Amino acid sequence: MMFDTLGKRCCPWRLKPSALLFLFVLCVTCVPLSVCGCGSCRLVLSNPSGTFTSPCYPNDYPNTQSCSWTLRAPAGYIIQITFNDFDIEEAPNCIYDSLSLDNGESQTKFCGATAKGLSFNSSVNEMHVSFSSDFSIQKKGFNASYIRVAVSLRNQKVILPQTLDAYQVSVAKSISIPELKAFTLCFEASKVGNEGGDWTAFSYSDESLTQLLSLEKASNGYFLSISGSRCLLNNALPVKDKEDIFTENLEQLCLVWNNSWGSIGINFKKNYETVPCDSTISAVVPGDGTLLLGSDRDEVASLRGSIYNFRLWNFTMDLKALSNLSCSVSGNVIDWHNDFWSISTQALKAEGNLSCGSYLIQLPAAELTNCSELGTLCQDGIMYRISVVIHNDFNHPEVKVQTKVAEWLNSTFQNWNYTVYVVNISFHQKVGEDRMKVKRDIMDDDKRLVLWALLVYNATNNVSLNEEKIKQKLMTNNASLEDGLRLCEVDVNQLGMCSALEDPDGFSWPATLPSVYKQPCPNKPGFFMTRACLSNGTSTFWGPVDTSNCSRQSNEVANEILNQTGDGQNLTSANINSIVEKVKRIVNKEENIDITLGSTLMNIFSNILSSSDSDLLESSTEALKTIDELAFKIDLNSTPHVNIETQNLALGVSSLIPGTNAPSNFSIGLPSNNESYFQMDFGNGQTDPLASVILPPNLLENLSPEDSVLVRRAQFTFFNKTGLFQDVGSQRKVLVSYVMACSIGNITIQNLKDPVQIKIKHTRTQEVHHPICAFWDMNKNKSFGGWNTSGCVAHSDLDAGETICLCSHFTHFGVLMDLPRSASQIDGRNTKVLTFITYIGCGISAIFSAATLLTYVAFEKLRRDYPSKILMNLSSALLFLNLIFLLDGWVTSFGVAGLCTAVAALLHFFLLATFTWMGLEAIHMYIALVKVFNTYIHRYILKFCIIGWGLPALVVSIILVSRRQNEVYGKESYGKDQDDEFCWIQDPVVFYVSCAGYFGVMFFLNVAMFIVVMVQICGRNGKRSNRTLREEVLRNLRSVVSLTFLLGMTWGFAFFAWGPLNIPFMYLFSIFNSLQGLFIFIFHCAMKENVQKQWRRHLCCGRFRLADNSDWSKTATNIIKKSSDNLGKSLSSSSIGSNSTYLTSKSKSSSTTYFKRNSHSDNFS
């Protein structure tokens, strides 16, 4: 009975209509959140952008809806909504259906179509949208899109350069930059593109536009300019030579300077290094200037990229502080905040992946560290000790209490008007009576804990902060302490400083906070004495002065450097730069260098020369200058000669007496025993030296009185390793000898009547043809140095393995050799003649290649067979090869690197295409004449085109992808004087593999095909009995000549252009190859009978015009009668298959398909 009753109640068809109506109303009123098939309309949207719509859009929205959307963005953003479509039931005051928009300040209702196409912005980082509909009249609804819009600089970066003055990015006028005796400057930057060039990242200048502080990249390195002093930063930047420090990704760079250091600290890519800059000692950066991002000068470009999170402090941070530097540490002089900057919206770009950008998830508070670990962060600020009493209601462990209090202090001071740092927090520990008092306090209430924190305030713009303000700030933020922690008491006291002090020795120590203070040693630049300001918790006092660095002698420092460069030491480019700077400092400091110190320094340079050439390149100029200065300062008071020999370097110094005719000569060779590295001789010289210098007898005559005082010595330096002499601007000449340097005192001698004679042995075992004498010019290649031949000539009387150079001045001398692909072996006159022939020939070839191509394109009957189509492709390749070659020199004159690279790559491509199509001509002849039977090839011409154009394109593409474009293609000089420039392949490996090697393969293939084809022609023509011997020879000769130009046999002259036959074969090569297009036109177009008929029919008039009824087909009917008569003719005209009747008469029927495509060509003669 019970189950029966239950069953009746559960059957819906047994319910009364009133009950059904009740259930329907209940469903509609209580479940309006989702509509069948339309999804939920109560959402929280936190994506950077997106869309949302009314329920069931674009269909009509249902009745009785109540929807809401919350759009949320991180701090520093606002929300922008745009209604793409809007159609809601319209009524006065929107009393029926409506959409409500809450932007954080006000709420607005919309209905009808009023909001369509409109955009609305929120005033905060959150916006609420609600939609409701009543029980009747449905409409289409709305479609809205939303996007975050960054308003805080934390979420935006600055794009540089900004060319218009109105868009320049500068510090706001309301911000006054104070006078700086120290600073820490950090910013993130990126660079667009790989092109080089000078740039400026930021510049700070006064009203007269005098630069006071800037970061620049120049041709010879990266510089930080401080009050007129330029400090080279290269040694501290972990980047390879010629690479930019900034890439496409933002990287943070921090610069630290104090006017008492004489150096600059650089933190970049998690690497902290210092570089010396003695000229900034005691320097001051004046205040009240203007700071710009980018360059403030027209002659220097701005960094092309972006800058982000630029912050400046008027104190220094050490490695620990920089490593722990977080986004919450605001710059006390300049911060990355809207209030500090004047930036046009055109210069800003918002991104969602910035290092200090806002996120919806709250980032953890920064970890606090001890002030002692932060170096000079605490040195220039005012320090306060904060004592807080916390009531621990829930008996949390002390570690948790300390963590929560640290987070509370950090958040309390994070966005305050004063720039302060909480750098330490700990539980209060005391001794004696104070300790007993604390203990009694805790016994009275075991939930009370006393914590001490150290607060550092760095005053900016003379804004004062006192203890009462700090205490008030903490008390008003009491509510932010959570988890059962209550603030009971706060006590703030300013920590004392060590008072200013002057020692009896005359050293002044300024008033400072507890830290280590250093100042330069007297009469010893680059070294510092130190003194610590100490604290015992209640007072501060000065510690003893540490002058150990000042007492170190140059010999001691040099020996330490020598140990750093000894055997087994792997020196990087940065290490070598640092070592050269240290040695330079020692050499500059000493007035006279004795033999002991000089030997140590020479051994340092010798060890450096054992490093790789790439690591030596950056420091080569400074190293050479330092070696020259070292040679000039070697002490000669006790001896007339000084010899210093090392493994890779030797120095000889000899005294001179002005007014005498006995200047010193010098020679250096290998020793007769193994007791030393080299053997030097001043005087008559050795019999077989590695290098020798003979000075002219009248060298010291006619010197001015001033110069006579300076000329007391002659310095000779021999370089066994030549890694310091790398000419980055020339890839054609290579150094093939040792390097010998010679100088007289400290003066410049040039334009000598009688030249100085330098004999140098070659380091290469192979014979050096046409050696070039040159000297090392340190001003070339943007101060990187390079070889210069001015004032030096090679003596005509040369022995194998050495060169005698006659020069009219003194410096570093060496012997160069031109690489085999260079044209410097050709004298200037022949170079001009060959250039003239080449350009005239290429012009003629381009004209007739175009004529050949135009003929076959214009007359459809001529291009029906395979040989004609192959000839058209070969003519196209030749035409573009000649045109690009003719335009190349003109394009080079523009000096646009990218355009030069493109032209060189195109020239390379069409050269390879020409080689390839000549090879395909040979392969086609082989197939047509030798492989006669069963040689049908599907899509024959298509496959040839894929090979003929695709293979060169593949080679050039691989080169462009696998190597940097500017390393492979670029400007090349040619001619003996290297004055003419051409866009071509720079890399010798690429040239020999992809040009010489590629051509070699094609050439030998064509030679083989040429021989096979000529054997076939001569064999078949020899069977004819109705032709005289003279006719036979002439026909075969014409076949040889026509095939020679068609298959590019004349390019083989390049293999014979060396040694004594170089000039004749260069002329043959230039004449025949530049006119290849003309010869192809003559033999394979103008002399073809079917071409002549088409010309006469369509281009001639009068008696020369061929009658229209003289049809081509009539001639074709006579082909059978001509038999092998025309074989040589058809071959010489590139119409291999035109004699198909003869060939197919002997072939199987299966070959007919192939040869019928070749049967439409006529024969010439």
UniProtKB/Swiss-Prot annotation:
Keyword Cell cycle among record annotations: no
Binding, Ca(2+): 89, 97, 134, 136-137
Subcellular location: Cell membrane
Spans traversing the lipid bilayer: 833-853, 874-894, 900-920, 941-961, 995-1015, 1040-1060, 1063-1083
SUPFAM superfamilies per the UniProt record, alphabetical: Concanavalin A-like lectins/glucanases, Family A G protein-coupled receptor-like, Hormone receptor domain, Spermadhesin, CUB domain
Signal peptide per UniProt: 1-30
Region (Mediates interaction with laminin-2) location: 446-807
Biased segments, Low complexity type: 1126-1154
Glycosylation sites recorded in the entry for this protein: 121, 143, 258, 314, 324, 353, 370, 410, 417, 424, 458, 462, 478, 536, 549, 563, 570, 665, 674, 720, 746, 781, 788
Stretch list, region Disordered: 1126-1165
Start and end residues of each stretch annotated as Stachel: 812-820
An MF annotation (GO) of this entry: extracellular matrix binding
Keyword Metal-binding on entry: yes
Domain topic, free-text comment: The Stachel sequence (also named stalk) in the C-terminal part of the extracellular domain (ECD) functions as a tethered agonist. In the inactivated receptor, the Stachel sequence (also named stalk) is embedded in the GAIN-B domain, where it adopts a beta-strand conformation. On activation, the Stachel moves into the 7 transmembrane region and adopts a twisted hook-shaped configuration that forms contacts within the receptor, leading to coupling of a G-alpha protein, which activates signaling.
Protein name: Adhesion G-protein coupled receptor G6
Gene source species: Mus musculus (Mouse)
Gene name of the record: Adgrg6
